[in-house]
């Protein structure tokens, strides 16, 4: 880590720390137009950042400077390595350190799963790293979280990695062919034409992770299978890495059917977002399974959040806004139910007849 020396504070509230940067080109650390340093300033707006030569001076309150120094240390470590180094990495690192000061962003972001055509596929948040680690340590893993958190992409990367390492003999990618209220019978074309759009995201991800010329051969040989969930019924899947995507659109019966396909030497990753259920009626199999299998060994539920969104930064804010809206809507619905129940009780009490005197006529004590 870079060495740092305290400079005499200008007063009791402000202190300065000088970070000496060694072993890395300042151009890489600063980024184009000092973009990365500006990202540090955005992460710690109360800290003044000044760069001169290979020195970075951080000035501000003691706690803020210490946090900024820790972030700079991690960025220097990443700059020395082969980590994809951009302003998103700075933002992610700052968020990691804020949520868990004991974590090392440089270590988290350096864990490459695959390298394809010069591009490394790796976890980009702490939540993603814990998710990937869970896949390594458990036979069945559920990745539950909002859109853009890398649930399916990382699961497929782990599947390709397992195939390349000969840990499994084939990859099976599946998803229910129900989405956004559409029914297959009303869609034009053959069954293949109807199903293909639902599976297209899986094909696209495969072509990013593997040589596009190799993928069709593996599909033709059955080494990689991409099929709708209905095609899993009645099968036992041995020595396979199986990924079920969009699991929130499975019924409880379909989820049970799918999980019981597990054979010897196989692993399963189930991904979904319980806030995007497209089933016309009934409950989601993904929602139910979190309660049914919560205590079963060798099954892990990894929950990702808006902090793990790796698409445009606006996506995370959109997810948070919808989460807040849904929570407020549920609270309002609950309040209405309580008011309605109280009103019904009042009406019943108002309409209840007075108790009648049933003593015989002429009765005396």
Question: Which positions does each model-derived feature cover?
Answer:
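Hydrophobic side chains in well-ordered alpha-helices
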Residues: 29, 36, 67-71, 255-258
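Conserved loop-to-helix interface motifs that mediate assembly, gating, or partner/ligand docking
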Residues: 97-126
